[in-house]
Amino acid sequence: MSLQGGCFCGAVRYEAHGQPFNSTLCHCTDCRKASGAPAFAWFSVKTVSLHWTASAPQRFRSSEHALRSFCPSCGTTLTWHDDRWPDEIDLATASLDDPEQLPPADHTFVRSRLNWVNCDDGLPQYQTTRSSG
């Protein structure tokens, strides 16, 4: 599978090859703050499968082991990478040219969900991560 996407202004573009995994709608406070949204859709790919095809994004360390990236021109959130899992990187689902092809498979960090966000879509819900339950 080949996935293409990029930022709002088009300055940063990427292509990812291979099978995406861990498609989720994250409700954690960090993702909400970084995106300015009530929840944020991510999917994972193998780090080696991600290639920047235009300008590269700006990166910043958002926590002890997390590195986020965004477009330095328009501010679009693009990636999240955890040092504890160096072989995978999360991409912002809505940054895909066709985000409809990767709907969320679950909700993560619902313990941090805003009370007015409705999660009655039948998808599995995890208090924190999938592995933590």
Question: Locations of the language-model features?
Answer:
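A short Gly-Trp-Pro
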Residues: M1-G133
